Each structure stands twice: as structure tokens, then as C-alpha cells.
A protein has these predicted regions:
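N-terminal Rossmann-like NAD(P) cofactor-binding subdomain of oxidoreductases
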Residues: 1-191, 227-228, 278, 292-293, ...
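Charged docking surfaces used in two-component/phosphorelay signaling
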Residues: 69, 158-334
């Protein structure tokens, strides 16, 4: 079997560590792993297939001989190293938002638009976590009738803000239990026993950057250039897995039975929809999973051509690391 030299840019972060874990779990044909990080992490090691692999400092020369680079770093790092990665002949599968809306860069959810991989010119973008979870859930509906508009509310776990998110939540809970105060450092407000209805800065007409990603990225992934999405993104005191409430609107009626049938067999989805027996997607059940759970499918009472649903997915795995590895799997099948 042919093997590949795979670099992970940002190997010490939460997503980078998960990428290394998923590479092992999915038996990706890695001949050599090259973990890359900042100078302060160089010389440390990561575990891969039972062995210690030394972390190297990210530099332009580090990509020589690499076949695939999995990006788990911030926008500035992705932009800094993208030219060197492409020049080296490697393919850059980037989890940052740096290139997502670039018309020359495919934006891929393998269950939705795998055919777009062939259009890459050295860079492929991984979509935003909540976008991945949502389009994986609703794409099956789009095969019944094109989705015209969507209204979504996201309930995003604290780990979506990085490794410091869960630590801050736990510290606040402990401080409150002891009657002490705790000054938030990761979030703009206390997150324990609270909701924060802002993720990202204001971008357009009162919508945040996180909220606009759902429309802009959803259009590109599902090949629906006229799709309109109104989204509200909320940070919630859940450690892991994002949840999304979605209303989809079509030009023709789509029944609940039709929706359940296509979602039950849709790639990357698991139908969990039995309200009578209290069975529906929940963050606790989807954490550390690679599929999106979908349920609470019902008519939209405000629109005869609308359907509502609820979906949950692990934003570190399917929303980031696993989706990137799935893209790499498409590349090696080419």
C-alpha cells in the first residue's frame, strides 16, 4: 500500500491533537508524520501509533517531501505558510477560515460535495464547525427539493473556543460553588450557568462573523448561490459538541416522512427522532463521534413549505479534525 508523509501544522492545539488521533483511528496510510508547531513546542513529542514523534518548528523548509499538510493553526499562520506548502508540492487541507471563500479554493464536506476536491490548486479549506454539522444534516433535504432559505440558532460548546474554554467553565463553576469571584479570560462574560449570544465580532447588519459563515459557506458547499440564511450563534456552558436548531424552507412542501427517510440513509447522519420515547440528539451522546445526529423533525408552523430539525455533532471531530482527514482520504483516492 502506498503511504504518505503527512504534516500537522499546529500539532499541539486541540484540533491538531485530534487530527493525529483520527489519523490513527481511521488507519490513514501515513508513512511518516511531521508534527509542526511554534518554536516553544519544538523538541517536545507527540504519540503516534505508540511511538514518540518529535515536534518540529514550523518553517518554510519543513514542508519539503511532505505530501499532505493538515492545517490546525490560526488564519495568520495559515496565510504565512500556504505559499511554501503549495510550492513544495504538498496539498494543504486548512482548518482556518483564511481561504474558505476564495473562489479558487474548494470548501469541502465529503458527505456533501466530494466532487469539488478535484478542483484544488494546492489548497482545500475545511469549513466552519457549525457549518459542517448543519450542512451534513440538511443536505439530504436538498436532494428532495432545493433549500431556499434557512433559519438557524447554534448552541456552541465552550471547547469551540479552544482548550481554555472548558477550563474557564470549570473554574467558574468551582468559584461560584465556593462563593468566590472569577474574572473571565476566555469569554467576554461569565459562561457558567449563562449563555453568551455573540461568537465573533460584528460583520454585517448586526450579524457576527460566526453567523455569516453559515450563509456564505453553506452557499458554496451546497452549490446554492442564492441561499439565504439567518443565524444566531450562542455560546453555551456545554463542554463538547455543538447543537443547531434549523428551519429549512423550500419552494414546494417536503413532508416529515420524506425528511426522515432521506436523513436515515444520508452519509454522515444518524436519525435519532422519537419524541414519545424521549430520543433525540444531545451533546453528551455525540461527543467523540464522527457523525451528525439529527432529530426533532417536524413541520414549520409558520411556512407550509418548511421543516424544522435539531442536530448535534462533535465540533472538534466532525466539525474539524475528522472532516479534514476525510478530505485527505478523498485526495489519496484520486
Amino acid at each position: 500500500m502506498k503511504t504518505y508523509t503527512v504534516a500537522v501544522l499546529g500539532a499541539t492545539g486541540a484540533v491538531g491533537q485530534e487530527m493525529i488521533k483520527v489519523l490513527q483511528e481511521r488507519n490513514f496510510p501515513v508513512g511518516k508524520l511531521v508534527p509542526l508547531a511554534s518554536a516553544r513546542s519544538a523538541g517536545k513529542t507527540v504519540k503516534f501509533r505508540g511511538e514518540d514523534v518529535t515536534i518540529q518548528e514550523a518553517a518554510d523548509t519543513a514542508f519539503k517531501g511532505v505530501d499532505i499538510v493538515l492545517g490546525a493553526a490560526e488564519n495568520d499562520i495559515a496565510k504565512r505558510f500556504a505559499p511554501a506548502i503549495v510550492a513544495s508540492g504538498a496539498v494543504f487541507v486548512d482548518n482556518s477560515s483564511a481561504f474558505r471563500l476564495n473562489p479558487e479554493v474548494p470548501l469541502i464536506v465529503p458527505e456533501v460535495n466530494p466532487e469539488d476536491v478535484k478542483n484544488h490548486k494546492g489548497i482545500i479549506s475545511n469549513p466552519n464547525c457549525s457549518t459542517i454539522i448543519t450542512v451534513t444534516a440538511v443536505n439530504a433535504l436538498n436532494t428532495i427539493a432545493p433549500i431556499r432559505t434557512m433559519t438557524a440558532s447554534t448552541y456552541q460548546a465552550v471547547s469551540g473556543a479552544g482548550a481554555g474554554g472548558p477550563i474557564e467553565l470549570m473554574n467558574e463553576v468551582e468559584a461560584l460553588r465556593e462563593g468566590k469571584t472569577y474574572e473571565p479570560k476566555v469569554f467576554s462574560h461569565q459562561i457558567a450557568f449563562n449563555l453568551i449570544p455573540q461568537i465573533g465580532g460584528e460583520q454585517f447588519e448586526g450579524y457576527t462573523s460566526e453567523e455569516m459563515k453559515m450563509q456564505n459557506e453553506g452557499r458554496k458547499i451546497m452549490h446554492l448561490p442564492e441561499l439565504k440564511v439567518s443565524c444566531t450563534c450562542v455560546r453555551v456552558p456545554v463542554v463538547r459538541s455543538h447543537s443547531i436548531s434549523v428551519s429549512c424552507h423550500f419552494d414546494v412542501p417536503v413532508t416529515v416522512e420524506q425528511a426522515r427517510e432521506v436523513i436515515a440513509t444520508a452519509p454522515g447522519c444518524k436519525l435519532v427522532d422519537d419524541l414519545k420515547n424521549k430520543q433525540y440528539p444531545m451533546p453528551l451522546d455525540t461527543s467523540d463521534q464522527d457523525i451528525v445526529f439529527v432529530g426533532r423533525i417536524r413541520p414549520d408552523l409558520t411556512d407550509d413549505n418548511g421543516l424544522c430539525l435539531w442536530c448535534c455533532g462533535d465540533q472538534v471531530r466532525k466539525g474539524a479534525a475528522t472532516n479534514a482527514i476525510q478530505i485527505a482520504e478523498l485526495l489519496v483516492k484520486e
